[in-house]
Amino acid sequence: MKKVVITGGTRGIGLSMAKEFLKEGCKVTISGRGSRASEELVVELKPYENSYQYVACNVRNISEVEALWEEAAKHWGSIDIWVNNAGQNVPHEFSYNTEASYVDAVIDTNMKGVIYGSQVAAKHMLEQGYGQIWNMEGLGSNDMIQVKTILYGTTKRALTYFTKGLAKELKGTPVMAGLLSPGMVLTDFMTKTPEGETSPVLQNKSFQFIFNNLGDRPETVAAFFIPRILATRKNDAHIVWLTNAKSFLRMMKAPFVKRRLI
C-alpha cells in the first residue's frame, strides 16, 4: 500500500490520477489552493473517504510545500510517491502582449513550484531511505514551439531539463526522479483561460482537428500512468502516453475514424 502526494490534485489529470491510485488501494494526499476541499471533490471521492486527505498548499511558497509533506507524512506515516502536478496556464496570447502578472504566475507555479516540491520530497525521501518523485511534462517539453503558448512551453521545457538533472543527482541513492508525459488532455487547463472563461483557441479549426485526433480524456491517461508508476523502480524513468508511433497511427486513421472531444 503506497502513500502518495499529488499537488494540483483537485481536478483534471491530477484528480484522475488520485482516483486511480485510490482504486489501487493507495493512501493519497491531494493538495490544492483552496482552504478546504470543494463539495464536488468530497462527493466524487466519497467511496474513498478513509483513504485520502485534502491539504491546502500554494506550491509557490516553499514553507507551504514543506508543511504539505509534514502533514501527509504525519497522517500516513510516510510518503512513497510525490507527484508535482500543479500547473498554471496563461492567456492564448503572444508573449510580448502577456501581462507581467501572468508571467510571474506561470514561472512561479510551473518552475518554482516543481523545484520546491522536488527539493522537499528529495530531502525527506533521502532521510527515510526510499521514494519516487514524478514531474509532469507538457507542451514544450519536447522542444515543439507553438505560438501564443511559448511562456507555458518554456516552463515545461525547463521542467524536463530540471528533472533529468535531478535524476542524475539522485543516481546511486534509494530515491528516483522521473517524468510523466500525458500528451494532450481534455481538461479545464486546456479549454479555459486563467479566469475560467472559454479559451479562444477552441475556435481554431486547426487546433480542433489536432486535438480531436491526438487528445484524450484525463481518466484514460491516468489509468495508463498509475500501474506503471507503481511498478517503476528505475531512476530517470519516462512514462509516455502519446508516443510518436501512437500519434502517427491516429493521424493516419483520421480520415476513417472520427474522434470528437471538443
Model-based region annotation:
Residues L179, T198-M251:
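C-terminal helical subdomain
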Residues S118-Q119, K164:
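A short, exposed helix-loop element centered on a Lys and neighboring polar residues
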Residues E93-S95, E99-I107:
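Substrate-binding pocket helix/loop in short-chain dehydrogenase/reductase
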Residues A56-A67, A100:
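The beta1-alpha1 cofactor-binding region of Rossmann-like NAD(H)/NADP(H)-dependent oxidoreductases
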Residues T10-R11, G34:
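Conserved glycine-rich cofactor-binding loop
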Residues E24-L41:
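Conserved glycine-rich Rossmann-like NAD(P)H-binding loop of the short-chain dehydrogenase/reductase
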Residues Q132-A158, T163-K164, K168-K171, M184:
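Catalytic loop of short-chain dehydrogenase/reductase
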